[in-house]
């Protein structure tokens, strides 16, 4: 597997966040955890970019994957800047698949 830059934005007490972390650890996929309680400004920025406040979210080499709140946002890519795009996903499993297939 090639080396990827993976940041995982997490909230304490979030079951989906725990599932993502546990799965990434089990698959031995390296990532940088970004606890929102410790880095609120970073998480506020991610929420602003995606338009959602559901966690977890991941930044996979500049593409922010998040659980879409609206069905119409699933699979929709939005270019924020030259370095950042967003992609609405259906579930944690979809995010994990995207990471594994990257």
Specify the residue positions occupied by each region the protein language model found:
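Non-catalytic, surface beta->alpha helical segment in thiol-disulfide oxidoreductase systems
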Residues: 60-102
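Short beta->alpha linker loops
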Residues: 12, 37-38, 90
